[in-house]
Amino acid sequence: VYIFQLNKVGLCKSIRHILSNPDIIKCGIALKRDLAELMQLSPFDPEAVIDLGAAARRADVPHHGLRGLTALFLGFRISKRASTTNWSARKLSAKQITYAATDAWVGRELYFKFRDKKLL
């Protein structure tokens, strides 16, 4: 997992290429706002973006958020405590970095579970 503070460095061409590449799947929960904020940094056409919360709703899964889906499909709970901290800080704390890495890893693992269970 790579963590970039894009509000500090901007959205470089290589990251825009990843976000616009239909061959690279990008997944997570409630991505609409994240994508809008990224497009404010630099315009791009998002491709192969999968919102797992929306997929869960379409499949009538009882949970739609990161914590609930993680518990249901991966069998453990993650803390959301660091999610409400100051993400614009010049230097992220170890807890913020761990949360961001966990969020990305869990999204990837949930994608595989959803794919295997044909929920996408």
Region locations from a protein language model:
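C-terminal helix/juxtamembrane-tail motif
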Residues: 116-120
